[in-house]
Amino acid sequence: MEAEAGGLEELTDEEMAALGKEELVRRLRREEAARLAALVQRGRLMQEVNRQLQGHLGEIRELKQLNRRLQAENRELRDLCCFLDSERQRGRRAARQWQLFGTQASRAVREDLGGCWQKLAELEGRQEELLRENLALKELCLALGEEWGPRGGPSGAGGSGAGPAPELALPPCGPRDLGDGSSSTGSVGSPDQLPLACSPDD
């Protein structure tokens, strides 16, 4: 039984001679069937290994393609980051320039505005001065008009009866609107050159 349990390669020549022909054929066929089964199992294992290798090779090819695509995207993103960084630097420089320009412009505007306010104050002071001068001149003209007005009329109760010469009568103070260019003062000069009765010494 122990010899039957082992293979033919484990039997000695005496044990094989002691066995019958039929037993040897039976053991040989059994070992051949076992070897065929092992070969079939090995073939199946090889097929499974080949299938797994093909799957792994396909995954490797897909990973290579994905790696190439990711590398291309990485290059694009790196270029985009470089471009955005340069644009950011350019924007910061432009912002600093605009800030400097705004500071200088606001300073210039404040200076111009201060000058304008100063000029406006000077003009207002000059305007008030001119208004006072105009009021004084107007009062002077009214006073002169009241002083010289009665002399151009008829004489009073103790007078000579004849009024002064027409050229002695002074026109009102200020420029006179000539209208058509005629003059009623008897002046021999140009119609535009009219005397002003603004001072008794005239």
From Swiss-Prot:
GO terms under biological process: cell differentiation; negative regulation of cell growth; negative regulation of DNA-templated transcription; negative regulation of fat cell differentiation
UniProt biased composition (Gly residues): 150-162
Tissue: Widely expressed including liver.
Claim: Nucleus is one of the keywords in the record: yes
Species this protein is from: Homo sapiens
Main subcellular localisation: nucleus
Annotated phenotype, changing residue 131 to A: Loss of interaction with TCF7L2 and loss of suppression of CTNNB1 activity. Loss of cell growth inhibition
Name of this protein: Coiled-coil domain-containing protein 85B
